[in-house]
Amino acid sequence: MEVTDVRIRKVLDGGKMKAIVSVTLDDAFVVHDIKIVEGQNGLFVAMPSRRTPNGEFRDIAHPINASARARIQNAVLEAYEHRDAAEF
């Protein structure tokens, strides 16, 4: 699996969510609404989720192993940091 495209929409409200991202995998499948969030230990990538009737959040789509998660997270954060640096 290869991340072939990352599209970033910055969130400018000053909150913890910094951007909403769409990731294309193998030029064949896209996952929308991935979030870049500022946490206590820096930026992290949150997979798209929805709230269940009992108030919990459940991922809609997510990697099923650590290797896939790392590839997606690295591609997303690299694109975000590259775009952020280009805006200054």
From Swiss-Prot:
Record Pfam families: SpoVG
The UniProt record lists the keyword Signal: no
Keywords: Cell cycle, Cell division, Septation
UniProt keyword Cytoplasm, yes or no: no
Coiled coil region boundaries: none
One biological process term in Gene Ontology: sporulation resulting in formation of a cellular spore
Function (record text): Could be involved in septation.
Sequence similarity: Belongs to the SpoVG family.
Name listed for the protein in its UniProt record: Putative septation protein SpoVG
